Amino acid sequence: MTTFFPAKVPTRYLRGQRLLKVTGVAALALTLFSAHASAEEKGMLETIHKHKFLTSTVPDNGDVNPYAVVVAPVSAGSIQKDDVLIDNFNNISNLQGTGTTILSYRPSTKETRLFAQIPQKLKDCPGGVGLTTAMTMLKSGWIIVGSAPSTDGTTATKGDGCLLVLDANGHHVATWAGPTINAPWGNMAVRDFGDHATLFISMAGFGLKGPEVIDPATKYPEVRHEATVLRLDLKIPQGKAPEIESQTIVADGFAQRADRDNFLFGPTGLALAEDNTLYVTNGMDEEITAIPDATTRTDSAGKGRLVTHGALLAWPLAMIMTSKGHLIVNNGKNGQTVEVDPISGKQIYAHWLNANQAQSPPGNGNLFGIALAPDGKSFYYVEDDINSLRIATP
């Protein structure tokens, strides 16, 4: 089933299979070098001291470049509560926008299995399938995942993509596509009530050309400001797949850019606070902004209110909210993750997750997806340089 819907008017050549070890100076940096932005404030990252390898994220078909990390909120189908779902953006040839697999890691048994493999050429999804960081599992057991497809690994052949609905056994049951969906990109923010839910997804593909289209002023691919954040309000009938009741563009005007090494840059991290403020990372501008009344607003807030900019942020990507209401955001330009107090706007702490000296700066391009662990004290993250799932713990 494909659902098309009109708009309510008013966002990485990565290191595929190259196995690199963090040793020597890099290991020392990983454990010792953390940057304090404020000595007075304490946060979650200051308590993190261990980084444990859990599993490879490469399935039998050879897909690489793990993106999304999602912790299962319930047991349903083949999934047990607290299982960790990870998807891949690249295929065995390391072409971006061609990954089709989702893996499931079970912390209780340390077992990893293939949860879903979606056909790469899916006619209802414009351009096919290339799974992104935009993935969630609802309390009703349904999985929703974004596709930003390509045929040559660059945005020159990018399709508009879609959102795919899977059941709890990994079967594809519905496709959502339409004029407001174009490269669903960043980690989803969700407000889930069981029989209905609200999703927030960044769309980073509108007007995007290939990386060969260069801005003569910058000598880089041209930057456009057409990326949006889309809110989908869903109803979830008992025993049936979710249905879209309404949809609203709650933010727009974010910077986006094609990139040969990174596929694209665009808004990536989304986190929803209890007061219904939606926080968004804007990597190109190295900032985090706030969208007020995100669950109820009927128009776009533009880019929203600036929360923090620059300093420890270096191409901020995926983001989570801690139990204390702080934001933790992974950097794309180095291997650090950064903690921010969104109320004061203070950047509290930066912590090395990946200090691989093979990149410059260390860890450049190695981090992406992140998810809070059920204990609220730890978090899962993926390392793209060695295609792995890890956990950071006290």
What are these regions (language model features)?
Residues 41-61, 108-129, 165-184, 235, ...:
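Surface-exposed loop and turn segments in beta-propeller and other repeat-based domains
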Residues 58-82, 97, 119-143, 149, ...:
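Beta-rich, blade/repeat-based domains predominating
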Residues 89-91, 147-150, 158, 192, ...:
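Short loop/turn segments immediately following the C-termini of beta-strands
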Residues 94, 102, 163, 208-209, ...:
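Structural signal for beta-propeller blades
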Residues 99-107, 159-170, 223-235:
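Beta-propeller blade signature
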Residues 105-109, 231-242, 291-299, 341-347, ...:
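Short loop/turn segments immediately following beta-strands, especially the blade-tip
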Residues 283-287, 308-352:
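Loop/turn-rich, solvent-exposed surfaces of beta-rich toroidal or solenoidal domains
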Residues 366-394:
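Blade-level signature of beta-propeller repeat domains, shared across WD40, Kelch, NHL, RCC1
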